[in-house]
């Protein structure tokens, strides 16, 4: 029985890995003047979890940064200053682009660029499956099925989001095309009116000069 469960578990793990978002650490090189940002377009009601760590090549100088995470409409979700590492977590309230910016603190980096390692997770990848397994008292294949169910649900929600975005973009495109058509008609009408006025003016001018 155990021999049959092992291949099944491996297969489920492979399916979850292929369906789930790939979570890799992002490396940013922050200039000693200015800031560097990372962003991701996320739909609403999605869990976001991220850890960040400043990496310095010189052990004598350990730079600090100011961190600000904002929602699509500018709401500040996380803000820290003079820090070398930290974590932020939130559940998105609206769909759009979420932005995390890192700015070097003055006189803490020796006027040299440095790097930041960011482990950014969203959706099913941000869930604490160990806690879920302990809470629901599940393990093995049952836990893998739970992960697979979450992955399928996340993909389904993402497809719905993409379909809604496509519908919104189509409406915007149709409105834009309609406005361009009206603008073209108005431009053509103005050109015709201006041409008629010019002809009328020239006719009156030549009649006044008795040229015609």
Curated annotation (Swiss-Prot):
InterPro entries: Emp24-like, GOLD_dom. SMART domains: EMP24_GP25L. Residues 133-155 form a coiled coil. Keywords: Coiled coil, Endoplasmic reticulum, ER-Golgi transport, Glycoprotein, Golgi apparatus, Membrane, Methylation, Protein transport, Signal, Transmembrane, Transmembrane helix, Transport. A motif (COPII vesicle coat-binding) lies at residues 205-206. It is found in: Endoplasmic reticulum membrane; Golgi apparatus membrane. Residues 26-179 are lumenal. GO terms for biological process: intracellular protein transport; vesicle-mediated transport. One of its GO terms (cellular component) is Golgi membrane. Glycans are attached at residue 82. The modification Omega-N-methylated arginine is found at residues 165, 170. Residues 35-147 form the GOLD domain. A motif (COPI vesicle coat-binding) lies at residues 205-212. Residues 201-212 are cytoplasmic. Residues 1-25 form the signal peptide. The chain crosses the membrane at residues 180-200. It is a single-pass type I membrane protein. Involved in vesicular protein trafficking. Mainly functions in the early secretory pathway. Required for trafficking GLL23, a component of the PYK10 complex. May act as a receptor facilitating its packing into COPII carriers and export from the endoplasmic reticulum. The cytoplasmic C-terminal domain contains a functional dilysine-retrieval motif, which is involved in the retrograde Golgi-to-ER transport of the protein. Probably oligomerizes with other members of the EMP24/GP25L family. Associates with the COPI vesicle coat (coatomer). Associates with the COPII vesicle coat (coatomer). Belongs to the EMP24/GP25L family. This is Transmembrane emp24 domain-containing protein p24delta4. It comes from Arabidopsis thaliana (Mouse-ear cress).
